[in-house]
């Protein structure tokens, strides 16, 4: 894979990638000129086709992890019978410890009261409940009741989160 900023090989074109996705600009043909903002030089980067695919996959991964963290953070207080402010989540596209995409739900109480341990014990139930909650939600692209409002976490958050939850639920059954 050629490094970012390298020249294209003869006969192989480069792709233009929107750093902030085009769809986030609410472009309406003939009604606004939002496409101009989306296509400003500061929002564009030129990538080789392979790098472009990786960039798109990275955005989907971030969306899925963000949606998962949102769903789990909303469900966890119900299982723990605690205030939602007692727990917090962290999303890492490449965690330095796991070296993999990681969501951590943890308690915010100094010295802890056992929420983290209980969350670990409940992880299968939480993942099943999250899958059920997101699947049953009638929204199309995400909402505050499931994976967060559309566009606040990333593109296709609900779809990406559902895919991730299905995989995680299958793995926890093994």
Task: Show the residue positions of the predicted features.
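Extended, highly charged accessory segments
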Residues: 58-174
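Residues immediately flanking
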Residues: 19, 50, 108
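Short, cysteine/histidine-rich loop/knuckle motifs that typically chelate Zn2+
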Residues: 1-3, 50, 143-148
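Generic recognition of well-ordered alpha-helical segments
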Residues: 43, 47-50, 129
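Short, intrinsically disordered, charge-balanced linker/junction segments flanking boundaries
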Residues: 51-57
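Histidine-centered nuclease catalytic patch
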Residues: 2-46, 55
């Amino acid at each position: 894979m050629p490094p970012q900023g390298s020249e294209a090989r003869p006969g192989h074109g480069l792709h233009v990638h929107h750093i902030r996705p085009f769809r986030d600009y609410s472009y309406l043909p003939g009604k606004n000129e939002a496409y101009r903002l989306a296509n400003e030089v500061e929002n564009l980067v030129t990538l080789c086709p392979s790098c472009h695919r990786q960039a798109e996959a990275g955005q989907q991964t971030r969306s899925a992890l963000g949606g998962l963290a949102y769903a789990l953070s909303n469900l966890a207080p119900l299982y723990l019978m605690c205030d939602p402010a007692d727990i917090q989540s962290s999303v890492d596209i490449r965690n330095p410890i796991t070296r993999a995409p990681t969501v951590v739900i943890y308690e915010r109480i100094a010295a802890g009261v056992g929420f983290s341990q209980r969350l670990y014990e409940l992880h299968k139930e939480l993942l099943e409940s999250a899958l059920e909650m997101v699947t049953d939600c009638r929204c199309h692209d995400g909402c505050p009741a499931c994976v967060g409002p559309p566009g606040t976490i990333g593109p296709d958050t609900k779809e990406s989160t559902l895919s991730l939850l299905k995989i995680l639920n299958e793995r926890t059954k093994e």
